[in-house]
Amino acid sequence: MDIWEIIILRPMINVLIVGSKFLFNSPGLAIIVFTILIRAVMYPLTKKQLLSSKKMQDLQPRIQELQKKYGKDKQRMAKEQAALLKETGITNIGCILPMLIQMPIWIALYQSITRILATGPEELLNLSRYLYPSWHIVFPMVPLNSHFLWLNLGSPDRLVILPILVGGSMWIQQKMVTPTNTDPQQAAQSQMMLIMMPLLFAYMTFQFASGLALYWVVSNIISIVMQYYITGWGGLTWFSKKNSQPGKPTKPTSAPKILPPAK
């Protein structure tokens, strides 16, 4: 075995099998609980990412001022914007770090699902290589029941339900952290990403094991809940206005005050 299999893949396979044992012999429930645990461990990074996104939204008035002042000088504009981000402590890596960390988890989870749901003799023999000999509880569990709700966790979902859940939940999660931007070019890029990413993951749901798509749905829902309690509805302005109480004073924004000219 290589380092990837020893450090990541093999532990994940055994944890999912043991989790299925204690969760009514259901790999689907094991994936859901596993997702919750992963997101709980990543909570500090996720919170930092959300707060950085919120700061970026609050900085939009100052960024717009820079665009008006240095709009024609792209080099000076980039320099001033970088200085502003440095001043406020916002880093691009802080915004994308949770996504980068989750990518190896996606790969390992996909590989784990395809192995733990083995049914053929050769597949079961290959699975036995990954089981811990000292964990006697895992051997009677194999082969696992691959069915969860309407899904066969080892195969793509041929219905439209799971792709809609994946794409819809990802769109909501991304919309909440997408800052309002008056710059036409950046606004167009944000809108393109807001549309393309959910469509891409919805398409991938038709290609990969539905167990991985189940992880995406649960992870997106957890992200939506976290974002609501940490930063509010964010870019979902329509939903935020609809649920606001009439007559309730709004919190002051962090936009700089404009003082009258001196006499």
Regions found by a protein language model. Give the residues of each.
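Helix-loop-helix
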Residues: 1-263
